[in-house]
Swiss-Prot record:
<dbReference type="GO" id="GO:0005886">
    <property type="term" value="C:plasma membrane"/>
</dbReference>
<dbReference type="GO" id="GO:0008285">
    <property type="term" value="P:negative regulation of cell population proliferation"/>
</dbReference>
<dbReference type="GO" id="GO:0048367">
    <property type="term" value="P:shoot system development"/>
</dbReference>
<keyword id="KW-0472">Membrane</keyword>
<protein>
    <recommendedName>
        <fullName>Small polypeptide ROTUNDIFOLIA LIKE 2</fullName>
    </recommendedName>
</protein>
<keyword id="KW-0217">Developmental protein</keyword>
<comment type="similarity">
    <text>Belongs to the DVL/RTFL small polypeptides family.</text>
</comment>
<comment type="function">
    <text>Small polypeptide acting as a regulatory molecule which coordinates cellular responses required for differentiation, growth and development, probably by restricting polar cell proliferation in lateral organs.</text>
</comment>
<feature type="transmembrane region" description="Helical">
    <location>
        <begin position="19"/>
        <end position="35"/>
    </location>
</feature>
<dbReference type="InterPro" id="IPR012552">
    <property type="entry name" value="DVL"/>
</dbReference>
<keyword id="KW-0812">Transmembrane</keyword>
<dbReference type="InterPro" id="IPR051525">
    <property type="entry name" value="DVL_RTFL_regulatory"/>
</dbReference>
<keyword id="KW-1133">Transmembrane helix</keyword>
<dbReference type="Pfam" id="PF08137">
    <property type="entry name" value="DVL"/>
</dbReference>
<feature type="region of interest" description="Required for DVL/RTFL small polypeptide activity">
    <location>
        <begin position="56"/>
        <end position="87"/>
    </location>
</feature>
<keyword id="KW-1003">Cell membrane</keyword>
Length: 87
């Protein structure tokens, strides 16, 4: 997953001021680029996060469904075994 801040740094070298290597200025400039120069890269990362969230939710639902199905199968087999045993 690409980080939006890194993506802005890579795709937006056209900033109105040069990046200063000093850490605090560098971070402030990256934050400025991130906030005031929106690029499709951030939209892509937000969409990716939404899709991953949906996948996680679907994974939990599928896991719960499989567990219920397995329990029902065991219950059904036990009932059949008891019915045949009583004959």
């Amino acid at each position: 997953m690409a980080y939006p801040l890194l993506c802005h740094y890579i795709k937006a070298p056209h900033s109105s001021f040069p990046l200063i290597p000093h850490t605090s200025h560098y971070i402030l400039q990256l934050v400025y680029l991130h906030l005031f120069h929106p690029l499709p890269c951030t939209q892509h990362s937000h969409q990716t996060m939404k899709i991953e969230g949906r996948r996680g939710q679907m994974g939990r639902l599928n896991r719960a469904f499989r567990e219920k199905r397995a329990r029902f199968y065991i219950f059904r087999r036990c009932v059949i075994m008891l019915l045949r045993w009583s004959d």
